[in-house]
C-alpha cells in the first residue's frame, strides 16, 4: 500500500502549479486529510477516498485558473533569504514564531491538561520530584505544567533566546521555583546528576546529534531519577509520507505566508502550530521502536518502558481506541518512553 500511495503522491505533485497559493492550499488540505479520516473512524477504504479527494483538488485548482487572474500578483514580499542557517537556531525560530501567537489561557491550559492526562494514563507522578529539567523547553508551557503537577523546582533550557524571553515573561512563578536558560540540549550547562526528572518532549529528533543529546540526559540524571522521552515514531507511515509531500510542496513557500493563510482561513493558533511544526522545522527524524531502544541501551540506560496511552489526538491513543486501523496510517505509533539508569 505504501508503494501505491507514494506513486499517487508523485503524480499529484507533478500536477500542482508552482504558485505559492496553490502549493500552500494543497499542503494544508493534505495534512487535514488525516483529520477527515479520524472523523470517519479510519475506514479501510481510505486510499480510494484519498485518490478521489486529490483528483477533486486538482479540478478545483483548474476552476480557479479559469476564474481568477493571478498573473499580476506579487509574492516578493514573502520571500526569504536565509538559505544558509544554523539548524538549532532555525528550529528555535520556527517554534518561537508559532508560540508567540498563543493567548495566555491557551498557552497554559492546553499543555497542563495534556500532560496531566498523559501522566495519569501511564501511571506517572512527579509530586515527589525536587529538581526537574525541561530539556528544550521552548516557551515554557510544559515547564509551568510540570511545576503545577508537583515538581518543587523546574529549570527550562532552549536554543532560542526569543523563546526564553517569552517564557520568562509568561511565567507566573518566582525565579527560584521556575527558571529559564538559553543553551543547547547537546551541551547543557548543568552539573552531573543534577535532576530527579528530565522532560525531553519532542526535541532530540530536531537535532543534528540525537545520541549526544541522550548522553547529556544520562549525565545529568540522578541514579534514582527518571526521564520522560518523546521522539517521533511512525516511521514509513502514511502520516510521514503526507508530511514529506507537504514539505516538498512548501519548500519554496515562506513560513509566514503559510501561517497568514491559515489564520485567514480561520485556523486557531493550536492547529496552526501543529501543522507548521511539521512543515518547517529543518530536521524531523523518525524512529522505529527498535532504533530508540538500541540508542537507549547504547547510552547506558538500564531501564525503559514504552508508554502507549495519551490524549485523544495522540497516535497511540488513536491506535488504542481503533484496534482495526490500517497499520500503515500511523505505523508503530509514537515513541514515548519512561527511562531510568537502573
What are these regions (language model features)?
Residues 275-291:
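Acceptor-substrate binding/catalytic loop of class I
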Residues 197-208:
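A short SAM/SAH-binding and catalytic strip from SAM-dependent methyltransferases
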Residues 5-100:
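N-terminal, positively charged/glycine-rich alpha-helical extensions of SAM-dependent methyltransferases
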Residues 186-197:
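A short acidic, Gly/Pro-enriched loop at the edge of an enzyme's catalytic core
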Residues 226-258:
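Conserved class I S-adenosyl-L-methionine
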Residues 133, 139-186:
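Class I SAM-dependent methyltransferase SAM/SAH-binding core
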Residues 105-128, 145:
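Conserved alpha-helix/loop element of class I SAM-dependent methyltransferases that forms part
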Residues 211-223:
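A short glycine-rich, Lys/Arg-flanked "PGG" loop and its adjoining helix->strand segment in the class I
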Amino acid at each position: 500500500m505504501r508503494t501505491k500511495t507514494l506513486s499517487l503522491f508523485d503524480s499529484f505533485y507533478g500536477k500542482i502549479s508552482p504558485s505559492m497559493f496553490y502549493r500552500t492550499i494543497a499542503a494544508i488540505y493534505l495534512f487535514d486529510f488525516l483529520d477527515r479520516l479520524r472523523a470517519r473512524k479510519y475506514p479501510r477504504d481510505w486510499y480510494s477516498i484519498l485518490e478521489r479527494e486529490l483528483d477533486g483538488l486538482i479540478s478545483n485548482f483548474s476552476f480557479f485558473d479559469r476564474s481568477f487572474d493571478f498573473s499580476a500578483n506579487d509574492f516578493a514580499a514573502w520571500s526569504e533569504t536565509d538559505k544558509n542557517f544554523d539548524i538549532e537556531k532555525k528550529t528555535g525560530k520556527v517554534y518561537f514564531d508559532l508560540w508567540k501567537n498563543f493567548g495566555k489561557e491557551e498557552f497554559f491550559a492546553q499543555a497542563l491538561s495534556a500532560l496531566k492526562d498523559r501522566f495519569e494514563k501511564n501511571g506517572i507522578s512527579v509530586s515527589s520530584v525536587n529538581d526537574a529539567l525541561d530539556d528544550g523547553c521552548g516557551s515554557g508551557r510544559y515547564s509551568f505544567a510540570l511545576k503545577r503537577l508537583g515538581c518543587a523546582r523546574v529549570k527550562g533550557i532552549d536554543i532560542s533566546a526569543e523563546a526564553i524571553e517569552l517564557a520568562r515573561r509568561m511565567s507566573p512563578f518566582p525565579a527560584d521555583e521556575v527558571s529559564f536558560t538559553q543553551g543547547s540540549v547537546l551541551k547543557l550547562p548543568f552539573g552531573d546528576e543534577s535532576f530527579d526528572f528530565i522532560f525531553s518532549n519532542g526535541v532530540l529528533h530536531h537535532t543534528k546529534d540525537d545520541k549526544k543529546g541522550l548522553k547529556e540526559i544520562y549525565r545529568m540524571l540522578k541514579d534514582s531519577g527518571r526521564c520522560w522521552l518523546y521522539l517521533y515514531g511512525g516511521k514509513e507511515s502514511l502520516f510521514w509520507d503526507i508530511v514529506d509531500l507537504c514539505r516538498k510542496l512548501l519548500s519554496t513557500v515562506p513560513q509566514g505566508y503559510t501561517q497568514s493563510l491559515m489564520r485567514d482561513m480561520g485556523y486557531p493558533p493550536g492547529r496552526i502550530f501543529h501543522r507548521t511544526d511539521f512543515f518547517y522545522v529543518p530536521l524531523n527524524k523518525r524512529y522505529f521502536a527498535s532504533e530508540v531502544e538500541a540508542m537507549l541501551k547504547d547510552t547506558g540506560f538500564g531501564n525503559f518502558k514504552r508508554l502507549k496511552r495519551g490524549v485523544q489526538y495522540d497516535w497511540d491513543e488513536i491506535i488504542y481506541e481503533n484496534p482495526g486501523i490500517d497499520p500503515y496510517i500511523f505505523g508503530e505509533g509514537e515513541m514515548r518512553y519512561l527511562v531510568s539508569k537502573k
